[in-house]
């Protein structure tokens, strides 16, 4: 199995790839300590125009990208991210020990799952049970991405999930120093992550009307989103004994972000901003980042070197 979370590397290019049946998202970023990341490419390539393997082919023909690290990202339907009580075992035995706990939690056979774990930040003093995040991925989905990417690049070294990709993006936000809520809008859902100083504290999926409704103008239940946000923020404060988060950032790559921003300001009274890549990246000339869900996630995957393992 590939290592899902490896040590960070500075002063290097990284490629984020999110393949799907209908499209492949590809992002290329260079990170250097003390500098804003350089965004060289962030696009979604429809399968009807170019196959996924052809999207990757130019990487080996370009000298500066040929040795770039490559992160592949699982689609949301191909894994589950859950919290479980941490078994009292040696760290090397942790994956095997949590597998049996997943039998009644995940919705596919645990025997078919590829398992990885990472720490949840320390809970408040009155919470005695240590919890951990567990990623259970469908083995066939992991194999499919490996077969697609590994033969076509030199350094395919990370398999990632969207929540961790969003964590990487959230860590770039100025408000992350005190804590920030990033809301990424997909087709039919919003993914919320709460981070502080680059650490993922909470991830929650919120169901929404499909963005593919006629004319793409499906309304979002802002009151419902605000309620889920408030529940998550309250949990963050009480469970982790943290100061309140005061800023929400929305990313969607379309007009929904601005509409939801205006509505959430009214619903919550909090500071709500739209994710703007030009404020966080040095964007190469001629690059117009596509920040719809697949592109946004690929961009976060390409920032893998920006964050340390939480």
Question: What label would you give each PLM region?
Answer:
Residues 1-310:
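Hydrophobic/aromatic-enriched cytosolic interaction surfaces used to assemble or bind macromolecules
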């Amino acid at each position: 199995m590939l290592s899902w979370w490896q040590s960070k590397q500075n002063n290097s290019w990284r490629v984020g790839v999110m393949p799907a049946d209908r499209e492949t998202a590809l992002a290329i970023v260079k990170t250097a300590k003390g500098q804003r990341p350089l965004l060289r490419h962030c696009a979604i390539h429809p399968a009807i125009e170019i196959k996924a393997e052809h999207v990757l082919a130019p990487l080996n023909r370009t000298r500066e990208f040929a040795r770039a690290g490559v992160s592949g990202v699982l689609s949301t339907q191909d894994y589950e991210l859950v919290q479980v009580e941490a078994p009292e075992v040696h760290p090397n035995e942790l994956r095997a020990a949590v597998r049996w706990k997943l039998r009644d939690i995940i919705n596919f056979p645990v025997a078919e799952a590829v398992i990885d774990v990472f720490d949840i930040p320390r809970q408040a003093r009155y919470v005695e049970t240590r919890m951990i995040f567990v990623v259970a991925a469908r083995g066939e989905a992991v194999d499919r991405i490996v077969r697609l990417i590994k033969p076509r690049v030199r350094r395919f070294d990370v398999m990632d999930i969207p929540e961790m990709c969003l964590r990487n993006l959230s860590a770039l936000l100025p408000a992350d120093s005190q804590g920030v809520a990033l809301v990424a809008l997909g087709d039919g859902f919003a993914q919320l992550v709460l981070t502080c100083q680059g650490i993922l504290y909470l991830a929650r999926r919120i169901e929404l009307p499909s963005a593919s409704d006629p004319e793409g103008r499906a309304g979002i239940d802002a009151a419902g989103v605000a309620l889920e946000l408030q529940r998550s923020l309250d949990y963050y404060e009480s469970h982790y004994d943290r100061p309140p988060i005061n800023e929400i950032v929305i990313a969607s790559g379309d007009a929904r972000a601005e509409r939801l921003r205006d509505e959430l300001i009214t619903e919550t009274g909090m500071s709500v901003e739209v994710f703007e890549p030009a404020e966080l990246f040095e964007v190469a000339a001629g690059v117009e980042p596509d920040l719809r869900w697949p592109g946004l996630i690929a961009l976060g995957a390409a920032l893998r070197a920006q964050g340390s393992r939480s």
